[in-house]
Amino acid sequence: MVREEVVGSTRALQWKCVESRADSKRLYYGRFILSPLLKGQADTIGIAMRRALLGEIEGTCITRAKSEKVPHEYSTIAGIEESVHEILMNLKEIVLRSNLYGTRDASICVRGPRCVTAQDIISPPSVEVVDTTQHIASLTEPIDLCIGLQIQRDRGYRMKTTKNSQDGSYPIDAVSMPVRNANHSIHSYGNGNQKQEILFLEIWTNGSLTPKEALHEASRNLIDLFIPFLHAEEEDINFEENQNRFTVPPFTFPDRLANLKKNKKEIALKCIFIDQSELPPRTYNCLKRSNIHTLLDLLSNSQEDLMKIEYFRIEDVKQILDTLRKHFAIDLPKNKF
């Protein structure tokens, strides 16, 4: 078989952004359509895209805060309206936009009385605060507030460790999820065999990226997951008996095992399980109780050995012999070697 390089979609699919708006600095909305799709394809794409949008896109957030002379997370500081815990929760909500990789340091250093907001965060040039008005703390007295911050790019949700650091730093639940929500719906049109579908995809983001950017990144991530299958070569699959990495999927014997009879030497017999056979439930259960799970296990026994199995009858042995002869051209010896 000649393998052709896949250069793109073979169908004339078109996508379009039909609605886009910014409800606030931290809430963007986009609505997209993809068509024409065959029946069932819209749901397949919609489910995959939603999972990729919610779980595969990286985001940047504050993961740790450090301040001196703070005994514990639930303590209060004179001259600050919020407790340390409330300040950490406010830092958790800060939305950042960046393309950094790894960990970066940032800081807050202000003097009261004043209101501390995200605008007061001193961050690297590669990090941008999406909404500078986000509240962090209220200083009610002329005191200094200095907080060291750790910024990290990741994906998904990572809970903080419960143990506080000895150096006065406190971990923050990392919510690296730029997409706040994603939904898909399907519109069908046409009649009979000509029925087609339109996929509607709705995306809400936190402002660190637009819905269109999120759609592009999710699509790239999905493509990256499937690329290995495009380059997989069938001849690389090894069926040697000494490698127990390949399991023959369940199949019915009359049709699928016809080919197995011709190629029995190429397939690891220990990877063919007896539950893939046509053996009656009673015979199957007796074999399992005797720790006979694979075809290789079965062939390691003689007819005499099988007759020693508890509750095993001569009819059961005959059934096994018929199955082996019919589908594998294999016979069991009457006695042990």
Swiss-Prot record:
Membrane spanning residue stretches: none
Catalytic activity of the protein: RNA(n) + a ribonucleoside 5'-triphosphate = RNA(n+1) + diphosphate
Residue ranges, annotated region (Alpha N-terminal domain (alpha-NTD)): 1-233
Keywords: Chloroplast, DNA-directed RNA polymerase, Nucleotidyltransferase, Plastid, Transcription, Transferase
This enzyme's EC code(s): 2.7.7.6
Source domain of life: Eukaryota
Enzyme class: transferase
One of the protein's GO biological processes: DNA-templated transcription
GO cellular component term, pick one: chloroplast
InterPro entries per the UniProt record, alphabetical: DNA-dir_RNA_pol_insert, DNA-dir_RNA_pol_RpoA/D/Rpb3, DNA-dir_RpoA, RBP11-like, RNAP_asu_C, RNApol_insert_sf
GO molecular function, a single term: DNA binding
Subcellular location: Plastid, Chloroplast
Family: Belongs to the RNA polymerase alpha chain family.
Purpose of the protein: DNA-dependent RNA polymerase catalyzes the transcription of DNA into RNA using the four ribonucleoside triphosphates as substrates.
Official protein name in the record: DNA-directed RNA polymerase subunit alpha
Organism whose genome encodes this protein: Acorus gramineus
